[in-house]
Design a protein with these regions (language model features):
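N-terminal interaction/assembly modules
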Residues: 1-115
């Protein structure tokens, strides 16, 4: 699996979490098995990102709220909330270049957005 494919799986799991209160650790294991994520570095990336976003969720949401102009966080759609949390996590916590984080978010949005 490529990093982009793993990011998509992270996005889908976080999207699911926004809609359904479920056992996230159980779902992480299921997704790893279902998606055949085999390589240890891929599994580590997948788990680290999901757990990191969840652990830092309050910080990420506050940073998003501080950035929004003319909008409230509550008005954002589920897709937008997940992609923003994901992107903010990559930029702020993981120190991924903003160009990469934004490009990855755009590519996921193109694939999963209805517009």
């Amino acid at each position: 699996m490529t990093r982009r494919q793993i990011r998509e799986e992270i996005f889908k799991l976080l999207f699911e979490r926004e809609l359904i209160d479920n056992d996230i650790q159980k779902r992480i294991k299921e997704v790893i098995e279902e998606e055949k994520i085999k390589k240890e570095d891929q599994i580590e990336f997948f788990e680290e990102y999901i757990n990191g976003i969840i652990e830092n969720e309050d910080i990420l949401i506050q940073r998003i709220k501080d950035t929004l102009d003319g909008w409230t966080y509550e008005r954002l759609g589920t897709l937008e909330k997940v992609l923003l949390k994901f992107s903010f996590y990559e930029i702020i916590i993981k120190k991924v270049g903003y160009e990469i984080a934004i490009n990855e978010a755009i590519e996921i949005a193109k694939k999963y957005s209805y517009n």
